[in-house]
Structure formats: C-alpha cells, structure tokens
Amino acid sequence: MNIAIVGTGYVGLVTGTCFAETGVDVTCVDVNADKIANLQQGIIPIYEPGLEDMVLRNVKAGRLHFTTSLESCLDNVDIVFSAVGTPPDEDGSADLRYVLEVAKTIGANMKKYTLVVTKSTVPVGTARKVKAAIREELEKRGESIDFDVASNPEFLKEGNAIDDFMSPDRVVVGVESERAKKLMTKLYKPFMLVNFRVIFMDIPSAEMTKYAANYMLATRISFMNDIANLCELVGADVNMVRDGIGSDSRIGRKFLYPGCGYGGSCFPKDVKALIKTAEQNGYSMQVLKAVEDVNENQKGILFEKLVKVFNGDLKGKTVALWGLAFKPGTDDMREAPALVLIEKLKQSGCNVRAYDPAAMDESRRRIGESVYYAHDMYDAALDADALILVTEWKEFRLPTWGVIKKAMKQPVVLDGRNIYDGDELQEMGFVYHCIGR
C-alpha cells in the first residue's frame, strides 16, 4: 500500500513513520524545503522519544520518503493524509487555509481514485469543504475522477506518541462510502490483528469526537484546579480529595492532577475552536468557557503565591524555574505555563534562571536571552531566592535537597505540580508551597 502524508509537523511525521513501521510505503510531503532537506539527512525537527530511531530505520528500509512535491506523489498513492496545521484565527476559530490548499492541489493534479483523509484537528463540516474544493478543481480541468474524503483524527500525547500510535486505545475513522471503509480497514489491519478497536462512524461524528475528547480532558484539569484552589481556602488537602473521588469507578484518577494549568498545541487551540463553532451555530458552550477561564487564571497562580511569600516585593529577586515545556517528554512550549510565569517575573524585576531537559533551544527561539539558561537543575538554583517547579520531568522528582538548599540564597520552593513531600522539605528548613493544600 502507498500513502502520502502532507505536513511533517508533530502529527504528520509521527503518523507517516508509524505507518511505515507496519510495512506501508509512505511519502511525507512538506512545503518547507529546509525541513525536508534535514529529514532526508536524518535530522528530526521535533523532540519525541523513539521517533528518530524509527525514522532512520524506515528510511534505510526504503519505506519512508520525503519530498516537497505533493503533485509528484499522486500517481502512485492510494490515500493522502492531510496533517497540516490549523492555527487559531483571530476570532479563535480554526484557520483551514492549509487544509483547503492541500485539497485544491489534490484536485488539480489527481489522475486516479484517491482517498483524502483529514488527520488534522478540524471543525465539524471541514470534510464537506475539502470535498467541494477538490470537486471545484476537477471541474476546472473538465475531469470527473472518483474520490472519497474521510476523517481520522489523531489522539497522540506528546512524549508518548509512538506508543500511542502503535498501541492505541482506539482508532476513530469517519467515512461515507464502502470503498473508503475498505481502504482504511486495510491500512489499519495490522492494528486490528492485535485487537485494537477501529471505530467507524460518519464523518461529522468523527470530526466532533476529537474536539469532544479534548473538551473532556481539559475540563477534568480545570475542574481539579478549581477544587484545589478552594481546598486551600477551606483547609482541605486536594491530594486526599483526589484520592477520594478518583477511587469512584465512574470518575477514575486520570487527568485529575492539580497544577499550574494546561498548555500545548491541542487543548488551548481546540477549546477556542469549539467555543467558536458553537457560537457560529447559535449555541454558547458555558462549561467550556469556564474551563478556559479557570486555566488562564491557573497559569498565574504560582506568580501570585510568590508575591505573597515576598510580601509583594519581587524586584531584584532571583527565581529558578525547573521546566519550560508545557509537559514532560517534549520540547513544545506552545501555550506553556512557563511563558506566562516568565513574563510576569520579568515585569516584576526578577532575574530568572531556567532549566529544562529538552526545551532550552525552543525557549531561546521564543524569548531569546532574557533569562539565564542553566546547565542543569542545580545550576538553576544557584543564588536563587525561590525555586519554582513548573514541569514535572522525572529528573526533577528526587533532587538532593541538601545541595539545593546550600546553593539557594533563600530556601523557598513553589511546587507547581505537587510532586514533593512538603513535610519533608519544611523539616529541612524550606518554605514550601504547592497547589491545593
């Protein structure tokens, strides 16, 4: 089977590489010539555990190829996946220009039946627009070539994307013809053989499923942060509350961790897009709006705690940050809580010493040299008046606190992910604050 993946960002590159791993011949397409040249040389543009080795293995095996020309692929492929970006527009809606450009290119150049599958996260109704764009280009050519559209949303977690793709909880596929269903069944057969669920449905339902999943996950995060903030006010311990409610089989423990807010390429963007989709259809998503509001407030909570510790006087203070990426296992800083915190610290006259195991280069690209980039987590703590944990990387979980205390100017720790034993740190002489207790 031959397929093309348009877009070599996070979703496209992982998707193409994992399909190649199952024996499919995959061509990854991107208009960015520098990115394609780097990929052809084995230089991977994103940090994702296991991806580089898998790319190199499949390139060597002759199953994975890279090009800037979608037109050159269309004679040979059975399926084209569109995995291009859908950035938020000024009004919060998803910008579909790249998705529709791909559709137009396919319509202008296809010579045989092609199944066009949208992998990007897109609003309900996008498949209809893709179909119309392809049909319009075919009409311009005076051609009546058969084609199908489908929706196959991704459910990958950054930092665990390879395992998520190769061992999925489920695969959601929206189709509108038996021919398209047979092709997608054939493509996903290696996964079906080991009893993974492939759920076929209509296309609008598949498009909505992705948004609904992210809505639910974002809601659980904001719900727990809301509860955590109230716990602090009434003297309850959010960790105990989490254990109490998470033990209920109807609720479960996943995505019930309080912290300093969610970020990344999906939740913030998709929440805004779903709110906008509802507005365009005359409906107001009241719960989802609250989810967004809670999260925006939560990103500032560590700064508020720091202000209280120093009685409002932060000017000249040195603050160490552990973690810059929006979550462990990635270098992605899109909508990261650390960005909000750094901006507030700099505005208050603080000196910032930051360390992240993967996101240092990305941070330099985003905010330049406005902070000191430490060599390791201990260097970050040197002469610091306060240490703030923002991202719960594994290497931050068991630091040598005696060394940290000696390095710091003042032993103040703000735990933005509730991973430390506050009683232990307080016994050692630290001032310790966390979320929700």
Please state what every model-predicted region is.
Residues 1-437:
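Structural/interface elements that position substrates and couple domains in central-metabolism enzymes
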